[in-house]
Amino acid sequence: MVRGSAKHEARRLRMAASLTELTTEAEKHGITVVMEEFDNLTAPYSRADELMWFMRHVPGLRCGFDTGNFLYNEEDAVKSFSLFRPYIASVHCKDRAFTENAGSPCVTVANRKLYPVAVGDGNLPIEKMMRVLLDSGYTGSFAAEHFGSIEQLKCMERSAAFLKRVLGEK
């Protein structure tokens, strides 16, 4: 679907209407609905500006901030983080590396390959983003994600150690 076309806009408006119904019902039950930027051009929320459109047009919708997805569209994760900070209700800590490994790469819109790595082992300033959130009083979750890794256990162990260190846990 071509962005900016009448068909694309109609689809986006239908999604916003459905999400508004969902967030309204969820709120009655104490549930927070989150949406994250998705690293695939078929989604009408794969870029920061598109996801922000939903944040601004769907009452009660919050951001599930995925640290690694903005690189797909060659967007700056830190700049996007600053933009979405007031909306963030949960964080997927997904690190990416430009160094080739055995994992399945995600290919960016600029045809660069991003490889899955343990949180803290890649090119993203995840610790910096976490500390800014924590310093602002954030009490939501930080989940490690290693989409495409063939070494899930190793990545999870390294990611857990990284997250515990940043969170000050033993």
Model feature map: region roles:
Residues 44-48, 52, 69-138:
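Gly/Pro-rich active-site loop or hairpin
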